[in-house]
Every structure is written in C-alpha cells, then in structure tokens.
Amino acid sequence: RCPSSPAFILPLPAQPTLVTQTDAGVLVALDELTAPEVVITLPSDDSGGGGFCGAALDGGGIGNGRGDGDVMVLQRGSTADYEYVVVGGDTGESITDWLTMAGYVLPADYADALTPYIAGGNFIFAAKVKSTVAEGALAPIELHLPAQDPGSFSIPYGLAAHSLPPGETLSLTTYLLASGTVVPGNYPFAAIDQADLIATSETETNYQELYNNAIGDPDGAWVVDASLEPFATADLNSSINTAIENGRGTGADPAAVTAFTERVTLSGARLTRIRTTLGADQLRDLTLTKATLDLHDPTMYVPYDADAGST
C-alpha cells in the first residue's frame, strides 16, 4: 500500500486472467487452519492437550489503448471497493509518471524501484480504493495468473522496502498451495522443532524466542508454521465456521469462503504457510522452488510440571 494513499502497486509476470475482490474471511479461514498454536499440557491432563484479489474484469476489460507517453493500459476495471489498471511500459519513469498523473502517491525513488521489473518484462497492476468506500480494513484483492512452474515465479516483496519507514520491519505471512511442495528459493527456512519448546509456566513458553532465533539470519529467513497434505477445500469451509464459533471471524462471510474454494481447484495439494519479519535491507523478491519438506502440524505440545519444572 502506498504511503498517504489507499492504493496497491504490484509487478506481475503476466496479465491477470481474473481480478476480483474477496472477503477477509478467506484469510481468516487460512489463518485458522494453519496458524501456530502451542498447547501446554499439565500432569493432570487426560486429553494430552492443555497470504487475494478478484471479480471478473469490469468497467472496460482488456485492450484500453495507450496511455500517456510510453505506457500502454492493458486492462482497466473495478470491484466493489477498488478501481484498477494493468499497465505496461518501456521504463520505470514513464510508468511512475503515468501512475502519479492517475492519482497514485509514490515514494520519490519508485521509478528506480520499478525499472528492474519493467526491464524483465513485467506488467504493473495498480489498484486504488474508491472515494465512496468508508474508512476501515481493506478488502483483500484476488489476482489469478496463467499457470506456470513455481521456479519461474517470484513474489515482489522487495518493492515494499521502498515504502518501509527507516528502522521499521514488515511482518509477512505467505500461503503456498501447489501440487507438490513449494518453499522459498532464496531465503533459508525451517519449522520450529517441538522438541525445543519449553514451558516456563502454565501459560508461557519460549516459542517467541525460538521464532526470533529462526528468523535471525542477517539476510532474512522464514519459519514454516504449517505444511499440510492433502489439502481439501472443505477444510477452509470448516475453518471459517470454527473461527466464527470461537469469536475470531467477526464479520467474515462463509459464503465468500465457499466461493473462493470453487475458484481454487487444487484439492489434494500441499498447503504450506511461511512467516517472517524483515527489515528494508532484508526485503527482496521471494523466489519459489519445489523441494522435499516434512509435513508439519501447526499445533505443538509441551508439558509443564510445576513441581519438576518444564520437561
């Protein structure tokens, strides 16, 4: 999101085949299914337990002609809350000039930031919130791209470094759903080992310390929160209902989650959630690769005995 403006800028390797606005419940359901949970067990316990955007092209569709200068407007449309364009151009400067004229507020060095993407043949997706939308949490945008091998795709997190305030960090959660296991290709990654967990009381553990250590690489690293297989779209429908029942899905729309699962037909695939916290000097585009990865349940158990201490 650009500073001082409710807008999104995203380089894409191909033109999207679908742009739509989805419900925040989709992210709530994914979080409910994959978020790490540490359960502290006590001696008396008998039970053993104590990252879319979419709507079909609208308001102009494809082929809207050339914009100002060297910028070609390839798609133009809208969702309930957003107006968006997909543009191509010859230089980062021509695209930033066009976006500025179109009302997007960009950092001073954004032309240089976009130049490598333009040189690599990327298109630029830009969306801004309609002036009629009330203030509050922004709805997720869902983009569908033509299928491609994970190794040829990267997520442009490096662009976020140009709008991150000095000294600040950015927390990222990424959901990877694919036929086969997909993991980061240019960052180290690991799951937190349940054997390293220590309960220091009936309610506290060293989980946060383990997480901080796991992402402590000077160049950045990711933690695997969950890696589940086989994934079934019914799992998301069940998860959103569980979240709502437990007060974690206020305002979420189960019907929107069902609609999302009908657009994502990868039942039986592997769902992996990775998470990190990075500074500007650690942010770079996340490349993906296929790899072997053990299944990892997001729920971990650690015993605590007040008399003997944690075991």
What feature does the model see in each segment?
Residues 1, 5-11, 83-86, 124-128, ...:
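Ordered hydrophobic segments in well-structured contexts
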Residues 1-43, 95-117, 121, 125:
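Surface-exposed, glycine/proline- and aromatic-rich loop segments on solvent-exposed faces
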Residues 2, 78-79, 166:
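Solvent-exposed loop and beta-edge segments used for protein-protein assembly and interaction
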Residues 13, 89-92, 132:
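Solvent-exposed coil/turn segments that connect beta secondary-structure elements
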Residues 15, 109-311:
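Accessory, solvent-exposed terminal regions and/or long lumenal/extracellular loops of proteins
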Residues 39-41, 45-103:
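Single conserved position on a long alpha-helix in the C-terminal lobe of the eukaryotic protein kinase
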